[in-house]
Amino acid sequence: MAAPHLCADGSCCSHPSAVPGVQQTLEEMDFDRGIWSAALNGDLGRVKYFIQKATDPSQPDSAGYTALHYASRNGHYAVCQFLLESGAKCDAQTHGGATALHRASYCGHTEIARLLLSHGSNPWLVDNDGMTSLHKAAEKGHEDICSLLLQHSPALKAVRDRKARLACDLLPCNSGLWDLLAS
């Protein structure tokens, strides 16, 4: 609620004092001031600060995303590496079932996907749509990540999502991935 201010005639009224559209909810303020925003923006110094202040590296925000989800999605390798070394759970799932590997795979961050796999991330986990990280990489045509995931777990290409689709069924038109995923 806006703070009352004095009108020109001296009476007290309740006019909004904030600029319309420039308000933040408490939830948004928590995000901006927390480890999630630092990870999203690749601010390793702030992420280290939060961890040194005993912030749980796997603490989820209101949507279930952890700092590792945000760093993975945005390609911040050093932040991902630090979070994993600080005990972040690589397979934490959002309310929609996404893992950091899902996010890195969808966004095309091959080296982060490799890092997550080297820390034990499970490529067999599915989101609420039944999609694996391979589905997410294929959907966006990320050949390097598809190859990486199949080197790690070749049988992933036989996994069907909740709509009975294989990863190869999600390939963009004219994708060179057909041979890799459909064979």
Swiss-Prot record:
What ranges cover the ANK repeats?
30-59, 63-92, 96-125, 129-158
Recorded hits in PANTHER family, A to Z, give:
ANKYRIN REPEAT DOMAIN-CONTAINING PROTEIN 39-RELATED
For this entry, the protein name equals Ankyrin repeat domain-containing protein 39
Q: Which UniProt keywords apply?
A: ANK repeat, Phosphoprotein, Repeat
What the entry lists under PROSITE patterns is as follows: ANK_REP_REGION (PS50297), ANK_REPEAT (PS50088)
Highest lineage ranks of the organism? Eukaryota, Metazoa, Chordata, Craniata, Vertebrata
- What gene, per UniProt, encodes this protein? Ankrd39
- The question of whether Phosphoprotein is a record keyword is answered with yes
SMART domains attached to this UniProt entry: ANK (SM00248)
Tell me which domain of life the UniProt entry assigns to the organism this sequence originates from.
Eukaryota
| Family recorded in the similarity comment | Belongs to the ANKRD39 family.
Name the species this protein comes from.
Answer: Mus musculus
PTM sites of type Phosphoserine: S153
The protein's matches in InterPro entries, at most eight in alphabetical order, are given as: Ankyrin_rpt, Ankyrin_rpt-contain_sf
User: Which SUPFAM superfamilies does the record match to this protein?
Assistant: Ankyrin repeat
Q: Does the keyword S-adenosyl-L-methionine apply?
A: no
Signal peptide from the UniProt entry: none
